[in-house]
Structure formats: C-alpha cells, structure tokens
Amino acid sequence: MKNNISDVKLGLLAAKIYWKSWRFLELTEDDIISIALHAEQDSKKRFNPEFGLSFDNYLKLNGANFIRSSFRSMVNKVELLDSKSKYSLEKQNTVLNTPENYLRSLEFKEIITKAFNKAKNDQERKVFSLYVKGYKNFEIAKKLNISPRRVRYLLDLFKSYIKLLTERYGY
C-alpha cells in the first residue's frame, strides 16, 4: 500500500517547506513522503513526555527542524553515492530550499543579481548583500548602524523586486 502525503503526519509540512523547489530538486512525492517519515522517526526518538507536551504539539513546534535535518541527511547520502559532476554536487549543496535560504538557490542567482542591480544607493546594496548572506534583520541593522525599521523597509523593497522579476521570468 502506497502512502499518501496527507496520510503521513509530517507529510503536508514537508510538502509546504519544499513546494518552491520540487522541480529544481527533482523531488517526487515518494521522496517527500520518505523525508517526512524519516523526520517522524527522528522526532519519536527525541520526544520526551516529561515536558508536558503531547506528541502532536511537539511535532507542530519542532516538525520543520526534523524535516530539514532529514532532508540534509538524504542529500548527504545521495552525495556519497552519486558524485558525478561538479554541477550536481553544487546543486545538492546549495539548493536546500527551505524558506530561509530559498533566495540562495542556483535557480534564482540571476534574479538576485538583477534585483541587486536595481538598488538605488550603497546602503540598499549593503543591506541586500548581507540578507542574501544569511544575516537576520537585527544583525544587519547593528552591522550597518541603521534602524531595524529601515532594514525591514529595504528588505521588503528587495523582496518586491525579486517577486516582480520572478513573475516576469517565469520561475
């Protein structure tokens, strides 16, 4: 009997996390199900009922972390078995399309550079580059000595550029 994504406890969450990268990562529904099952097994090992949480609430709070770690372990296994070309290795290492580092994937490198080129001044370019490198809003504000509100505004601008360019180029 074949599992369905909605039958697995973490299946829908895994599908939601990787919805932007199905095509580029070449993930099938079975891959997503296996990621979700692996994450569920891992969470069962680490679950401790002494803290007063039910298992379902524990999954709601920590499910995304377990899914990401099981995906990384799956990618590492693939990398060990199949290290054909530099491109495939680069694709495996850089495209972990969780919402945080979705912008750093290879597919959107061109979009990011075009959005970066739309920046009107040096401050915008610095904020954009730090954001793409993985810094959080508050860290960017501290580093560049500007207000967090200004950082939020500039990042919203950057994300709107990316959204516009994404729609234009059909990614």
Curated annotation (Swiss-Prot):
Gene3D superfamilies: Winged helix-like DNA-binding domain superfamily/Winged helix DNA-binding domain
One GO BP annotation of this record: DNA-templated transcription initiation
InterPro entries per record: RNA_pol_sigma-70_dom, RNA_pol_sigma_r3/r4-like, Tscrpt_reg_LuxR_C, WH-like_DNA-bd_sf
GO molecular function: DNA-binding transcription factor activity
UniProt superkingdom: Bacteria
Protein's name in the database: Uncharacterized protein MG428
Organism of provenance: Mycoplasma genitalium (strain ATCC 33530 / DSM 19775 / NCTC 10195 / G37) (Mycoplasmoides genitalium)
